[in-house]
Curated annotation (Swiss-Prot):
Any single GO CC term annotated in Swiss-Prot or TrEMBL for this entry: cytosol
A GO molecular function held by the record: RNA binding
Free-text function comment from the UniProt entry: Required for rescue of stalled ribosomes mediated by trans-translation. Binds to transfer-messenger RNA (tmRNA), required for stable association of tmRNA with ribosomes. tmRNA and SmpB together mimic tRNA shape, replacing the anticodon stem-loop with SmpB. tmRNA is encoded by the ssrA gene; the 2 termini fold to resemble tRNA(Ala) and it encodes a 'tag peptide', a short internal open reading frame. During trans-translation Ala-aminoacylated tmRNA acts like a tRNA, entering the A-site of stalled ribosomes, displacing the stalled mRNA.
Record keywords: Cytoplasm, RNA-binding
Localization, UniProt: Cytoplasm
Gene Ontology annotations of biological process type: trans-translation
Matches recorded under NCBIfam families: PRK05422.1, smpB
Protein name, per record: SsrA-binding protein
Main location: cytoplasm
CDD domains (UniProt xref): SmpB
Amino acid sequence: MSIIDNRKAYHDYFIEEKYEAGLVLEGWEVKAIRAGRANIKEAYIIVRGEEIFILGMHITPLASASTHIRTDPTRTRKLLLHGAEIARLIGKVERAGFTLVPLDLHYAKGRVKAEIGLAKGKKQYDKREDEKKRDWEREKQRLMRVKA
């Protein structure tokens, strides 16, 4: 079950492959995510050396967060993947013109995981075409309901 979805990613990109990655989080961040106080709409993923990081993910601290901890809502967080997956992703991002986008945050075995997608950007006409398809499907469903 998803905690937070990034629907904008599906609108702006063609998602080719999906991967599940762990996140390196602090305690207050996990509590805030459980409370649904995270935002990944403006987040993006970069490769630094042999590691993958997520930037721009905003986690709003709870009011009850400890006062002796300095909370940084938009700090850079490391993503945890297997070495072979990282190597494959780095190769595709650097050579094939793909990008990495966060798709959602969810729980797996009690831990917060991020689903990331290997994506290619959509052109404006692709977005319009998708919208036309979606509208036609909606209209088709409406017509079927009226007939029945």
